[in-house]
From Swiss-Prot:
GO terms for molecular function: magnesium ion binding; thiamine-phosphate diphosphorylase activity. 2-[(2R,5Z)-2-carboxy-4-methylthiazol-5(2H)-ylidene]ethyl phosphate binds at S136, I137, T138, G166. This is Thiamine-phosphate synthase. Pathway: Cofactor biosynthesis; thiamine diphosphate biosynthesis; thiamine phosphate from 4-amino-2-methyl-5-diphosphomethylpyrimidine and 4-methyl-5-(2-phosphoethyl)-thiazole: step 1/1. Its cofactor is Mg(2+). Binds 1 Mg(2+) ion per subunit. Belongs to the thiamine-phosphate synthase family. The keyword S-adenosyl-L-methionine does not apply. Keywords: Magnesium, Metal-binding, Thiamine biosynthesis, Transferase. It comes from Nitrosococcus oceani (strain ATCC 19707 / BCRC 17464 / JCM 30415 / NCIMB 11848 / C-107). GO terms for cellular component: cytoplasm. 4-amino-2-methyl-5-(diphosphooxymethyl)pyrimidine binds at Q38, Y39, R40, D41, K42, N70, S109, K139. The gene is thiE.
Length: 217
């Protein structure tokens, strides 16, 4: 499944998006060329989170795109999502793999730590994420990753690399050229007035990869 980690990785954060617009926003991102979606909700509202994730899973299936759940392997398993993304304080790769199975996508936040990424690959991660790369309102943490780190990671890792933090259509190409397989975007996509056009602007940097297409029913 790691082969699907490429192109525009759209992170639908409910802290940023009005909940009534969540499904429509994700559909527009997929229409514009997003390759996969992450559902990110840090609340403890179990029922609402289940309903939202289940709805996004149906939308993602329509566009044949994987859905990744942030920091909740159990929710991912309950709705049949393709995988989970884990941060520094989340559950382990081993426990997530036991819950989701061998075919699930498991991604790991590595911030600016190459050693963490190497350990994640050895533990069975399907992709690693570095960032933030540039100033970002939605990723204000004082942790910086550099393009040099991406280049070094590309030399040392044999799995997809996701870059995140302040990535725009204008600076995305240098991130890709440094070694990123995918660019993860939150505000640059979902705070745009035209989400579909914004997604297409990112997607143009990955011309050899086809746009997701709706299934025919």
């Amino acid at each position: 499944m790691s082969s699907s980690i490429r192109g525009l990785y759209a992170i639908a954060d409910t802290h940023l998006l009005p909940r009534q617009d969540l499904g429509n926003a994700v559909a527009l991102a997929l229409q514009g060329g997003a390759s996969l979606i992450q559902y990110r909700d840090k609340s403890q509202e179990i029922t609402r989170r289940y309903k939202e994730a289940e709805s996004l899973q149906r939308i993602c299936h329509q566009y044949q795109a994987p859905l990744i759940i942030n920091d909740d392997a159990l929710l991912a398993a309950e709705i049949g999502a393709e995988g989970v993304h884990l941060g520094q304080d989340d559950s382990s790769i081993t426990s997530a793999r036991k819950i989701l199975g061998a075919k699930a996508i498991i991604g790991i936040s590595c911030y600016n730590d190459l050693a963490r990424a190497i350990a994640a690959e050895q533990a069975g991660a399907d992709y690693v994420a570095f960032g933030r790369l540039f100033p970002s309102i939605t990723k204000p943490e004082p942790i910086w990753a550099s393009l040099a780190l991406l280049r070094e990671a590309r030399k040392n890792l044999n799995l997809p690399i996701v870059a995140i933090g302040g990535i725009t259509p204008e600076n995305a190409l240098q991130v890709i050229e440094a070694g990123a397989s995918a660019v993860a975007v939150i505000g640059g996509l979902f705070k745009s007035r035209d989400i579909r056009a914004a997604a297409a602007a990112y997607r143009q940097h990955f011309p050899s990869w086809n746009l997701p297409k709706p299934r025919l029913f």
